[in-house]
Amino acid sequence: MNMALISLAIDYKKSPIEVRSEFALSGLDVSMLYRSILAIDNVVHAVILSTCNRTEVYLEISNLRVVDDILVWWQGYVRNPNYKIKDYFKLRQGTEVIMHLMKLACGLESMVLGEPQILGQVKDSYTLSKKNHAIGKELDRVFQKVFATAKRVRSETRIGYCPVSVAFSAITLAKRQLDNISSKNVLIIGAGQTGELLFRHVTALAPKQIMLANRTIEKAQKITSVFRNASAHYLSELPQLIKKADIIIAAVNVLEYIVTCKYVGDKPRVFIDISIPQALDPKLGELEQNVYYCVDDINAVIEDNKDKRKYESSKAQKIIVKSLEEYLEKEKAIISNSAIKELFQKADGLVDLSLEKSLAKIRNGKDAEEIIKRFAYEIKKKVLHYPVVGMKEASKQGRSDCLVCMKRMFGLNVEK
């Protein structure tokens, strides 16, 4: 069966967050999703990726006309009928799918260029597909090459070390100041958009504990509810929370400092304030044991890293192009070897049947020389039957290129 590789995607480049939310497949029963998409005729294998910035479905299909059926399937999960998937989705095919997936896993397609979290999300999607028996050999080879490429990009470039967003830069600064973050407690003050983004970046680092403090605890609880080592708190609990914390990051709207020197003892801490107006007293940084960063410090890091990240991005692109070439060459070899194996099996089948008949006749006393001549004639006819039919058909259609190719295959003179 001839397979085609395609992907259908809705992402932040074309769709605002309210649209992405409507078409998101996260939060649904994963097994049910895979059962339903694999039940569509001509869908053979699938991997579903759904994050806050994109939802993408990677597929092996046996007929390109199935795209309309897949769109109908996806539309069925949309709550608001005013949103039509045909207005937002992007279709990729063949090599374009592999190139996109490589760039995606390396962070080159992310809203924050080079951010590392997407690779983990792609790996999780791949694992879920395997768990649901939804991935085939070709798609599996694609993802394995993608992961190897992402690993190479991370090891041979510094694209993940050059943060260009305030939240991501803040987390990067915290990582630089503290070794073994898995043993540290992190306090995030504020559960707004930036605070939530901070929280998600921190969870990817797997610290010992994450505490999220907010004026209204309901919002903090909503953000922390799905994470085992996370807890939600009122702002009034700050004095107790600060005592536990090794890293304190503030992203909250206040009119005066809510953390001052009176809250801290001799324990070394990293304070990062991305609030405007400032929420953490700058005098915290004057204490010898503390490290203090404000928005201006972070913006300086961002500006300094923009050019670096562009340079690292170009290096990553070259690695991806080379990796794609390697993958395609290997696939050609796999296809070629498969075709050669099938050709020999076909020949064996033709020879074995005729040979058995010929040997039986010889054993029954028939003229061996005559039988061997007949055997050779029959094999010649059988082996050349399909090539001759193909050459005649190519000639009828004016496909001189096919004729030349077949002549070369059989060692004939291509000039005639």
From Swiss-Prot:
Catalytic residue list: 52 (nucleophile)
- Indicate the segments annotated as coiled coil, or none if absent: none
Q: Where is this site: Important for activity?
A: 100
Any one Gene Ontology molecular-function term assigned to this protein's record: glutamyl-tRNA reductase activity
PROSITE patterns membership: GLUTR
| Notes on the domains | Possesses an unusual extended V-shaped dimeric structure with each monomer consisting of three distinct domains arranged along a curved 'spinal' alpha-helix. The N-terminal catalytic domain specifically recognizes the glutamate moiety of the substrate. The second domain is the NADPH-binding domain, and the third C-terminal domain is responsible for dimerization.
List, in alphabetical order, the GO biological process terms annotated in this UniProt record. Answer: protoporphyrinogen IX biosynthetic process from glutamate
Q: In its UniProt entry, what is this protein called? A: Glutamyl-tRNA reductase
Similarity comment text for this entry = Belongs to the glutamyl-tRNA reductase family.
Q: Identify the keywords attached in UniProt to this record, alphabetized.
A: NADP, Oxidoreductase, Porphyrin biosynthesis
Give the record's pathway.
Porphyrin-containing compound metabolism; protoporphyrin-IX biosynthesis; 5-aminolevulinate from L-glutamyl-tRNA(Glu): step 1/2
- Sites where the protein binds NADP(+): 190-195
Q: Which NCBIfam families match?
A: hemA, PRK13940.1
User: What EC number(s) is this enzyme filed under?
Assistant: 1.2.1.70
The task this protein performs is described as: Catalyzes the NADPH-dependent reduction of glutamyl-tRNA(Glu) to glutamate 1-semialdehyde (GSA).
Q: Which organism is it from?
A: Francisella tularensis subsp. holarctica (strain OSU18)
GN (gene name): hemA
- Other known facts: During catalysis, the active site Cys acts as a nucleophile attacking the alpha-carbonyl group of tRNA-bound glutamate with the formation of a thioester intermediate between enzyme and glutamate, and the concomitant release of tRNA(Glu). The thioester intermediate is finally reduced by direct hydride transfer from NADPH, to form the product GSA.
Look up keyword Transport and say if it applies: no
- Residue positions annotated to bind substrate are 51-54, 110, 115-117, 121
Reaction(s) catalysed by this chain, per the record, are: (S)-4-amino-5-oxopentanoate + tRNA(Glu) + NADP(+) = L-glutamyl-tRNA(Glu) + NADPH + H(+)
SUPFAM superfamilies referenced in this protein's UniProt entry, alphabetically? Glutamyl tRNA-reductase catalytic, N-terminal domain (SSF69742), Glutamyl tRNA-reductase dimerization domain (SSF69075), NAD(P)-binding Rossmann-fold domains (SSF51735)
Which InterPro entries does its entry note? 4pyrrol_synth_GluRdtase, 4pyrrol_synth_GluRdtase_dimer, 4pyrrol_synth_GluRdtase_N, GluRdtase_CS, GluRdtase_dimer_dom_sf, GluRdtase_N_sf, NAD(P)-bd_dom_sf, Shikm_DH/Glu-tRNA_Rdtase
The record's subunit annotation is: Homodimer.
Please state the span of the N-terminal signal peptide per the UniProt entry: none
